[in-house]
Amino acid sequence: MATKKTSLWLYDTTLRDGAQREGISLSLTDKLTIARRLDQLGIPFIEGGWPGANPKDVQFFWQLQEEPLEQAEIVAFCSTRRPHKAVETDKMLQAILSAGTRWVTIFGKSWDLHVLEGLQTSLAENLAMISDTIAYLRSQGRRVIYDAEHWFDGYRANPDYALATLATAQQAGAEWLVMCDTNGGTLPGQISEITTKVRRSLGLDGQSDRQPQLGIHAHNDSGTAVANSLLAVEAGATMVQGTINGYGERCGNANLCTLIPNLQLKLDYDCIEPEKLAHLTSTSRLISEIVNLAPDDHAPFVGRSAFAHKGGIHVSAVQRNPFTYEHIAPNLVGNERRIVVSEQAGLSNVLSKAELFGIALDRQNPACRTILATLKDLEQQGYQFEAAEASFELLMRQAMGDRQPLFLVQGFQVHCDLLTPAENPAYRNALATVKVTVNGQNILEVAEGNGPVSALDQALRKALTRFYPQIADFHLTDYKVRILDGGAGTSAKTRVLVESSNGDRRWTTVGVSGNILEASYQAVVEGIEYGLRLLTCGLTNQEAISS
């Protein structure tokens, strides 16, 4: 570990910059929920949005005036005044004052190209806009963070002018000067070099509390936003701006879920309290749920696969000493170790899964190698158990002689209609007939559904509910299809993953066949069987029915 270093200030802009990602649209409730979760995580600065830009942001700031956050500073965001306009009559600046926040972030132009062609004003007027805006907000009792937009592009194009914009903000009273890599095109070596030059040019030696401090705001268009942020900090920046899960326009912003653990656990900066760091993974996943985007399973630190081990040698080693293949303990960020089963698995993978499933199994048990051989044979046929652990548990129990079926499907038929009357929209319907045996009794049932898989699922549950009333709570929650050998055309083999739920738990099963309906049937039947096992574990068939 490095020697203990100065505290860093984290600044989250998920609610504004993150919301600019294509596919994200936050409601007022979404924004308030995210803000409160970030507050609980210990983020000191949370940018709420641009007051006056839309009614939702106005309402957001009003709500937080009525019910403030516990610890975090909520920050209002706005641009400098418009060219040749007075600050007192600028509607956007009046709106930012109405937001009632102690801190405000003002962004201004650093690149002469944007001043001359974007704003269509003079370089001198742009400096006046920066100075007037910050001085006015300071006179109104606000503390100011200055975001230097396109800072690194501006510095490369015209270093003297770019530095003049920061010096102007410094003289006007900004407490933080944040260098923004708005286009995301700057590489790590340039970030480090330029940040060092800025600190020296502006005399920011950190010896006086009255000096402004430097910050970094990196975009990920070159895939280096996290690296750029880390190097800026090492070169003297004390504020790091970013978003949860790296959400943001185009390729996104610096990912705070990656930055925070790197800064705190690797570089020994104070960011958030250690006990709060353990909530990082749950925060990442909650926010991905709120924005309705699938979590990145392979995200560093917080991804589902961040501490997943697949190769048999790796698994064996990590069970002896986790640090052989893990750079940190997963629980530090609220994540967990996972042992993945696949054709690359060894006995250690199988034994680890057996322990997880509560199956008594050791290396000397012949079933152990039977399970491993079956696994590799099935994966050769196209099965994949990494995302279908319910099917793998059933496979293991089958090998152990611990899979007494609670029902037996004798057969099924599915009939589909597709009618398109001229006067009506397309009408689609499917009808499934199933024959099931339970405890020696044969049941024939028919059910309709919105498509063949839905109809089959409905018919099976309808047939079994009289024996197992718990099935009424089962629902098919996700259905995924993958063509395994597309070159085979319509005879291609298909893999189907079905996710089921009983309201409390979710589980996934898999089926493979050249017939998509049969693959679906396999996955649906195993899904129902596994759900029943959750509820009737350790009971005989007759006991399960009676209960």
From Swiss-Prot:
Cystine pairings recorded for this chain: none
Superkingdom of the source species: Bacteria
Keyword tRNA processing applies: no
EC nos: 2.3.3.21
Domain Pyruvate carboxyltransferase: 8-278
Top-level class of the enzyme under EC nomenclature: transferase
Transmembrane regions: none
Keyword tags: Amino-acid biosynthesis, Branched-chain amino acid biosynthesis, Isoleucine biosynthesis, Transferase
Keyword Transferase attributed: yes
Job description of the protein: Catalyzes the condensation of pyruvate and acetyl-coenzyme A to form (R)-citramalate.
Family designation: Belongs to the alpha-IPM synthase/homocitrate synthase family.
Protein name: (R)-citramalate synthase
Organism: Synechocystis sp. (strain ATCC 27184 / PCC 6803 / Kazusa)
Taxonomic lineage from the root: Bacteria, Bacillati, Cyanobacteriota, Cyanophyceae, Synechococcales
